[in-house]
Amino acid sequence: SAKKLLEDAYLTQSAAFHIHQSVEKCFKALIEDLNLRVPKIHDLEKLLGIIIEHDIILKTNTEIISMINDVYIETRYPNNQGLIPEGIPSIEFIQEIYSFAETLYNEINQLLDK
């Protein structure tokens, strides 16, 4: 879904939401593969922490994870204006986090195939 929304400046908040969902599901799939109970949380930093605690090191960027987390919270639970603190996410920002999520998906997919 996020890929279809990448080029529309009016839909960047929706794209950010779908990107977060994608990263969240990837992390949860990896946690499930470790035979752990998958927590009912949406916090990417906490999910990544669980993965790291089990000695799995991903080529991830915690700064981008934090940004995706922040955008998700603000798009899911917007303030009075319905915007994230910095305003509506730019297309460039959405393309950056989409590219990151796609790379992360491929990395986790390879780990799950082993």
Identify what each model region corresponds to.
Residues S1-K114:
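Terminal alpha-helical segments
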